[in-house]
């Protein structure tokens, strides 16, 4: 493993409620190892996969582990560095792994960034289903942030988090078979995640 991991992740509880407010989960997961694949509309998303399954290990950017203080909490929360080999190994051990296929945060709260193929490749190599997850926040900024880069948008959101502390609904979709052409399955995964957006559901 790229970084040591603790046997049982301890998901953050107080911090998400402080940053987000009320949390609600809709849907259930199948038993056994799965790859959770979620949209990435806020830096706060990283705390939410543990609400879907407490033992889930989230793949995060290596930069997170470069800060000693942050690394301490990242390990406690079950975060691991992004690595296809490590993710596959964890899944084959029977653990649940989580990933945001866009990699970057979609600061507008809209599905505008493409999914990378890593999620499908991980699920295929591990032989586990992918489970689409959608994070729907109670309030999110409008198009007024579009003139700014995604980095600046996220700085704005970080500074204004009390204003956007309106709760979140975590919507869990049906498991997906990863078998098939990687690019096509990646498109299908993105469509499945996007379809969970409340406005699009029937």
What are these regions (language model features)?
Residues 33-35, 96-100, 131:
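Residue-level preference for the first positions of well-ordered beta-strands
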Residues 1, 108-117, 184-202:
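Soluble, non-transmembrane catalytic domains of enzymes that act on hydrophobic metabolites at membranes
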Residues 28-86, 109, 141-142:
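Catalytic core of membrane glycerolipid acyltransferases/transacylases, capturing the structured
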Residues 6-40:
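Helix-to-loop junction immediately C-terminal to a conserved catalytic motif
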Residues 17-25, 78-82, 151-155:
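Short gly/ser/thr-rich secondary-structure transition/capping motifs
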């Amino acid at each position: 493993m790229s970084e040591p991991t603790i046997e049982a992740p301890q998901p953050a509880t107080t911090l998400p409620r402080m940053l987000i407010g009320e949390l609600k989960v809709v849907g259930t997961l199948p038993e056994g190892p799965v790859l959770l694949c979620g949209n990435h509309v806020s830096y706060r998303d990283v705390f939410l996969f543990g609400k879907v399954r407490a033992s889930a290990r989230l793949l995060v950017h290596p930069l997170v582990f470069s800060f000693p203080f942050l690394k301490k909490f990242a390990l406690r929360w079950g975060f691991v560095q992004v690595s296809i080999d490590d993710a596959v190994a964890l899944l084959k051990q029977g653990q649940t792994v989580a990933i945001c296929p866009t990699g970057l945060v979609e600061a507008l709260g809209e599905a505008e960034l493409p999914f990378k193929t890593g999620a499908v490749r991980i699920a295929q190599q591990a032989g586990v289903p992918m489970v689409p997850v959608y994070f729907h926040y109670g309030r999110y900024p409008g198009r007024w942030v579009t003139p700014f880069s995604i980095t600046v948008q996220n700085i704005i959101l970080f500074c204004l988090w009390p204003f956007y502390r309106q709760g979140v609904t975590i919507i869990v979709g049906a498991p997906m078979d990863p078998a098939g052409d990687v690019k096509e399955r990646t498109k299908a995964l993105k469509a499945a995640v996007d379809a969970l957006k409340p406005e699009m559901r029937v």
